[in-house]
C-alpha cells in the first residue's frame, strides 16, 4: 500500500517522510541503467560539449504522499547523468495542500524539497495562500534552501526593504562546467486567482513573458551563462512569445501535460500536477557564453517511469513501488521507523 507512512501524527509526517526520502536519495545508484534508463547524451571534451540534465515538477501542492515517488525519479534522473542533474519546480510547490502538509503550514513539503535537493523554483500563486508576507518571511526564508524566482514582480518589491525581499529575477548554477541561468515568472492573471490584497502586495509590474525575455537577454548578452531555462507559472500557451535567448521553458498552473514551441524555437513542457509527472531533458551545450549552442533532448528514464502523451514528460506516480526501486524504499523504511520512534 503506497506511502502509508505519511498518514498519521506529526512525527510521522514531518520527520518520517523526510527520512524516507533522504534515504532514497543517498542509496547508491545500483539500479540505474540496468532496467531501462536511456544512455547519457554524452560529453565531448574535444569540442567543449557538456550535458546538463534538468528535471522539473510543477504544482506539487504539498502532496507529500507522492514524495518518495519524486525522490526516486530525481535519483534516477541524476543517475542518468551523475552529478549533473538540476531539480527544479515551476511553482505551487506549496499551498492548496492536503491536510498532512497543510496542518503544518507546508513545512513537511519544504523539508521534503530540501531532501530532494530542490534549490530553484518559480513563485506560483499558491505560494501566497497565507499572504505575501508569510511567503517571503517563512516559505522563502533562505534556511529552506530554495531560490524563488519572479522576474515580473517589481524591482522595488524585491529590494531589501520590499515585501518580496527573498525573491529574485534569476539564479545561476554551474554544473558539469556549464553555467545555467534560470529565470522565473508568475502568471499575469494573478488578480483572477488571488485576493486583491495579495495582488497588490505581489506588485507584478511587467508582463511575465516580457520579464523573462528581458532577464534572459541580460544573462545571455553578459556572457555570464551558457544556457537559459525559463520557469513560467502559467499555462504552456502563455510561453508562446518567449524569444530566442531562452533554451527551454517549463510551465505550470493549469495542471496539464502539454508541449509547445516558443517564438524563439525553444521547447515548452508542462508536467501535470500533484507529483504525478516529471519533465526530464538534457541540455547538450557546446561552447561558452554568447557563442554557446544548446540542443535539448528529451530523456526517457525507464526504471518504472511511464510514458505520457508528451515526449519528455514522464509518469512517476507509484514509482517507489516499482520492483526496480523496492530495495531502495525498503532500506528507507527501517530508518524511517527509527526516526519516527525517536520523536
At which residue positions do the language-model features occur?
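Secretory targeting and sorting signals
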Residues: 4-37
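Short linear interaction motif-like sites in intrinsically disordered regions of transcription factors
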Residues: 5-7, 117, 149, 329
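Short, functionally important structural connectors and interaction interfaces within domains
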Residues: 12, 17-18, 270, 306, ...
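Intrinsic structural disorder/low-complexity segments
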Residues: 23-28, 129, 256, 310
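Acidic, metal/ion-coordinating pockets
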Residues: 36-307
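A short C-terminal boundary segment appended to hydrolase-like catalytic domains
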Residues: 285-343
Amino acid at each position: 500500500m503506497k506511502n502509508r507512512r505519511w498518514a498519521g501524527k506529526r512525527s510521522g509526517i514531518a520527520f518520517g517522510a523526510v527520512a524516507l526520502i533522504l534515504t532514497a536519495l543517498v542509496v547508491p545508484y545500483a539500479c540505474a541503467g540496468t532496467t531501462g534508463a536511456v544512455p547519457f547524451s554524452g560529453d565531448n571534451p574535444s569540442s567543449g560539449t557538456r550535458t546538463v540534465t534538468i528535471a522539473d515538477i510543477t504544482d506539487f501542492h504539498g502532496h507529500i504522499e507522492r514524495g518518495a515517488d519524486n525522490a526516486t525519479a530525481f535519483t534516477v534522473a541524476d543517475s542518468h547523468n551523475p552529478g549533473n542533474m538540476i531539480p527544479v519546480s515551476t511553482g505551487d510547490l506549496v499551498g492548496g495542500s492536503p491536510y498532512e502538509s497543510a496542518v503544518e503550514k507546508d513545512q513537511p513539503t519544504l523539508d521534503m524539497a530540501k531532501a530532494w535537493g530542490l534549490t530553484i523554483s518559480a513563485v506560483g500563486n499558491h505560494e501566497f495562500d497565507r499572504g505575501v508576507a508569510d511567503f517571503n518571511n517563512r516559505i522563502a526564508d533562505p534556511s529552506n534552501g530554495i531560490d524563488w524566482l519572479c522576474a515580473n514582480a517589481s524591482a522595488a518589491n524585491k529590494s531589501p526593504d520590499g515585501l518580496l525581499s527573498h525573491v529574485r529575477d534569476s539564479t545561476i548554477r554551474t554544473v558539469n562546467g556549464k553555467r545555467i541561468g534560470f529565470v522565473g515568472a508568475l502568471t499575469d492573471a494573478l488578480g483572477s486567482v488571488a485576493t486583491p490584497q495579495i495582488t497588490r502586495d505581489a506588485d507584478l509590474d511587467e508582463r511575465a513573458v516580457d520579464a523573462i525575455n528581458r532577464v534572459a537577454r541580460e544573462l545571455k548578452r553578459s556572457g555570464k551563462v551558457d544556457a537559459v531555462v525559463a520557469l513560467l507559472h502559467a499555462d504552456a500557451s502563455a510561453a508562446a512569445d518567449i524569444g530566442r535567448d531562452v533554451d527551454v521553458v517549463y510551465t505550470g498552473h493549469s495542471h496539464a501535460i502539454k508541449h509547445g514551441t516558443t517564438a524563439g524555437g525553444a521547447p515548452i513542457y508542462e508536467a501535470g500536477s500533484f507529483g504525478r509527472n516529471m519533465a526530464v531533458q538534457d541540455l547538450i551545450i557546446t561552447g561558452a557564453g554568447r557563442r554557446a549552442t544548446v540542443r535539448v533532448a528529451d530523456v526517457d528514464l525507464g526504471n518504472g517511469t511511464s510514458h505520457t502523451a508528451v515526449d519528455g514528460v514522464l509518469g512517476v506516480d507509484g514509482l517507489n513501488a516499482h520492483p526496480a526501486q523496492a530495495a531502495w524504499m525498503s532500506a528507507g523504511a527501517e530508518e524511517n521507523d527509527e526516526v519516527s520512534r525517536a520523536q
